From Swiss-Prot:
Species, as recorded: Human papillomavirus 9
HAMAP family: PPV_E7 (MF_04004)
This protein's GO CC annotations: host cell cytoplasm; host cell nucleus
Transmembrane segments: none
GO molecular function: DNA binding; DNA-binding transcription factor activity; protein domain specific binding; zinc ion binding
Name used for this protein in its record: Protein E7
Length: 93
């Protein structure tokens, strides 16, 4: 500071000296790319569904939360499971 009051260029210069240290702060470390999604854990489920003839069918699956919800939607909607006896009858029709 040259006078009794600081001028704008002098204040900016002093702030730059405080903000910009002389040490090299650039990081040259390379990071390996990680998968965007974390692995979701598989949980065992037992699915009990009925065939059209009334037989009970059991399925055992490993699924994520999203996967078991999708399976539930399919079984309640567009997909129907059949027992081995009904499958045999369907083959001969």
């Amino acid at each position: 500071m040259i006078g009794k009051e600081a001028t704008i260029p002098e204040v900016v210069l002093e702030l730059q000296e405080l903000v910009q240290p002389t040490a090299d702060l650039h990081c040259y470390e390379e990071l390996t790319e990680e998968p965007a999604e974390e692995e979701q854990c598989l949980t065992p489920y037992k699915i009990v569904a009925g065939c059209g003839c009334g037989a009970r069918l059991r399925l055992y699956v490993l699924a994520t939360n999203l996967g078991i919800r999708a399976q539930q939607e399919l079984l309640l909607g567009d997909i129907q499971l059949v027992c081995p006896e009904c499958r045999g009858r369907l083959r001969h029709e």
